[in-house]
Amino acid sequence: MSDLKTESQDLQQEENALIALRKEKLAAERAKGNAFPNDFRRDSYCNDLQKQYADKTKEELEAAAIPVKVAGRIMLNRGSFMVIQDMTGRIQVYVNRKTLPEETLAAVKTWDLGDIISAEGTLARSGKGDLYVEMTNVRLLTKSLRPLPDKHHGLTDTEQRYRQRYVDLMVNEETRHTFRVRSQVISHIRKFLIERDFLEVETPMLQTIPGGAAAKPFETHHNALDMAMFLRIAPELYLKRLVVGGFEKVFEINRNFRNEGVSTRHNPEFTMLEFYQAYADYRDNMDLTEELFRELAQLVLGSTDVPYGDKVFHFGEPFVRLSVFDSILKYNPELTAADLQDVDRAREIARKAGAKVLGHEGLGKLQVMIFEELVEHKLEQPHFITEYPFEVSPLARRNDDNPAVTDRFELFIGGREIANAYSELNDAEDQAERFLAQVAEKDAGDDEAMHYDADFVRALEYGMPPTAGEGIGIDRLVMLLTNSPSIRDVILFPHMRPQA
């Protein structure tokens, strides 16, 4: 332990010395005048040039003398040439001793990795075939005071990558790719829904009554109104108010907040897509979800086969559709239907499986507890799990043939819940009764039970058309499409404990 501490202290002293040297260089730049100029305008991106001129030979480029202006961060400085990086990629810039003044040539030698420069010149190709910019002008735009991570080891400390995402993005192409994919996924989802006549909307983040999901909210205080408020746990009840109002197809992509544990699958602040369509049911949403996921896989991976860890998920095949009840029996053949239909036996199974059983749960909730403990983690390929008991689905419509369950599904891939959807409950009186049952659950000690929302009941009393709604966790979806093991890998700035 002592050796590790000494090594850490030595590294810190070395970094401090490098920072001090860079600050001296910045002081010299300040003495010359404006050390942070902002009058350069580039006309090209590094990777765009690589793509656009990939088929041009050395001779063709020399004859064309194509002028370009690029800018980026120095990732390599050999004195005779540098490699710079912008948001699209990298390109070499050649230090031409014939066209650059002596003062500039001397300055280039003092520039450090991480410095940001502008470069003007013409495109050329090296004998090895690399595209580069033969510079006629180069300037320092921003002096970097902190050294980049060692190029041989990179930024490998996972916690440091999360805490200093800006450095992670500078040095890790894999990280940059992940967040480009995330942006691509969100953009395509938006396009997919708008093409199907959905209207994008925004609903309140601050709410007086948290609702729309079984979760513990963050609480805050509105000073001007002198009242308690909550960060939303879901936008559902507001989106359904919009359906009541006549916006029959709506969606929102935004943040939700849940004051719960942190894990590789959970972050207290996360991004959710929720959409609602009138005159549809949960089966329509299954079809829509399969279509969306296939398009996203094809867009990102060029295939409907999605590699994740040592597995491959097949989005091109029909997703399995199985009820909660049937899935328990399928994946636990030692259990019988009679076991699941007896309250005392179901309670015993749930407790033995590791569920937190309080003792007042009904049969439906116990079945879901058993499912969560004994089945969820076994659902590797895409599964629509349907027919959730009404006790755990306070906002979902009861099934016409079996009122003990609801017209609801959750989508599981790789043992993780990715989406939750149902035919919406539009019976105002039934909704009021279910809210009251949730209040009783909360009084009995369930922190995640819902509050009574009188205004939402009033909205339903005006009449909501038959509607289907769905929520899809964007972060978990991006995890799948980028083969990322932790939700923190796909959130730019995940929540972390304060450093000691």
From Swiss-Prot:
Primary location group: cytoplasm
Residues the entry annotates as binding Mg(2+) 1: E410, E417
Cofactors, names only: Mg(2+)
CDD domains membership: LysRS_core (cd00775), LysRS_N (cd04322)
Enzyme class, spelled out: ligase
Cellular compartments annotated: Cytoplasm
Subunit field text: Homodimer.
NCBIfam families referenced in this protein's UniProt entry, alphabetically: lysS_bact, PRK00484.1
HAMAP family: Lys_tRNA_synth_class2
Official protein name in the record: Lysine--tRNA ligase
Species for this entry: Pseudomonas putida (strain ATCC 47054 / DSM 6125 / CFBP 8728 / NCIMB 11950 / KT2440)
